[in-house]
């Protein structure tokens, strides 16, 4: 299987003082997911949130389900987020990290390697993206930031040098975006 789990469990409780929920699962290859959330009455009709979410995926084989163009994906995905604020104005603080990403794209004749991405959320209003990816003798760097609101602007910058974008019999494409 591309993604297996064991010991999956959820638990919830409704009380006058608080509503709580938990999720836990051991994933294949030593991965796991764990989350806790608690809602307590706040001022007026507000519900105050307090919780966290942790994720560790030590196998990225599931990526092959998302695209038939990507084969042999590798690397590790981890996340650690704190949940706070209120139900009407939640705050999410934390980071999602992709480390050691590698994959092949046979149609383009390339092997991606040493990929690294960090997505940091600040106050559920803003996120910052940073990453890099190697192919051939070159590297791409990505950086960006944006907001989570529907009308929030998002900026992404891609820079690089000598990144092998395609290596097929008809063409060898090396890019250096700035």
Please provide the spans of the model-predicted regions.
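Interface amphipathic segments
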Residues: 1-178
């Amino acid at each position: 299987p591309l993604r297996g789990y064991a010991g999956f469990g959820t638990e919830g409780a409704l009380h006058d003082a608080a509503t709580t929920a938990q999720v836990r699962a051991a994933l294949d290859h030593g991965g796991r997911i764990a989350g806790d959330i608690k809602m307590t009455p706040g001022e007026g009709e507000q519900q105050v949130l307090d919780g966290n979410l942790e994720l560790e995926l030590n196998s990225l084989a599931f990526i092959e389900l998302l695209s038939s163009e990507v084969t042999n994906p590798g690397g590790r995905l981890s996340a650690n987020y704190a949940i706070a604020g209120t139900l009407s104005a939640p705050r999410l603080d934390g980071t999602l990290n992709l480390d050691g990403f590698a994959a092949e794209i046979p149609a383009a004749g390339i092997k991606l390697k040493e990929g690294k991405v960090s997505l940091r959320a600040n106050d559920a209003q803003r996120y910052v993206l940073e990453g890099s990816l190697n192919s051939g003798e070159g590297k791409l760097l990505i950086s960006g930031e944006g907001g989570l609101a529907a009308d929030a602007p998002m900026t992404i910058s891609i820079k690089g040098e000598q990144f092998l974008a395609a290596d097929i019999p008809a063409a060898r494409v090396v890019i250096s975006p700035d």
